[in-house]
Amino acid sequence: STKNGRDSNSQRLGVKVYGNQPVKAGGIVVRQRGLTFKPGNSMKVGKDYTLFSCKDGIVQFETNGKTKFVHVY
């Protein structure tokens, strides 16, 4: 037998709702480790850095220099 027979479950990170798509209040937009995307208008950060929407609307991504923001309008 071999000592290498282990594998971890995937963490399922990434963008869940893309730009110009609708989102409901409380809907998860980005799952991330650390603040790769920062919260913009009507967005909040969960304790595991998840970005979620505070209101119903359309998701918009914005890059300001090196900083990436996610907004809901």
Swiss-Prot record:
Keyword flag Hydrolase: no
GO CC annotations on file: chloroplast; ribonucleoprotein complex; ribosome
GO terms under biological process: translation
Record gene name: rpl27
GO molecular function term, any single one: structural constituent of ribosome
InterPro entries documented for this protein: Ribosomal_bL27 (IPR001684), Ribosomal_bL27_CS (IPR018261)
Pfam families, per database record: Ribosomal_L27
Protein name, as recorded: Large ribosomal subunit protein bL27c
Assigned protein family: Belongs to the bacterial ribosomal protein bL27 family.
Gene3D superfamilies: 2.40.50.100
SUPFAM superfamilies: Ribosomal L27 protein-like
Keywords (A to Z) from UniProt: Chloroplast, Plastid, Ribonucleoprotein, Ribosomal protein
Compartment(s): Plastid, Chloroplast
